[in-house]
Amino acid sequence: MPEIYVYAVEGRSLDQKRGLVQDITAAVVKNFNVDAASVMVQIVESSKDNKAKGGVLFSER
């Protein structure tokens, strides 16, 4: 069972998340030759106060 984790800052809509997991699932099905039902995708969100890039919090960008 392939498991894919997506780490992202919170703020995406449910429609955006739905589209992402559908696209990821389709790519795994195509490239790994597995059934869609066996593909697990988990979106792990963090607040902008808890994530930084280049030493700058996303909430301060």
Please identify what each model-predicted range represents.
Residues 2-61:
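A domain-level signal for the structural core that forms small-molecule/cofactor-binding pockets
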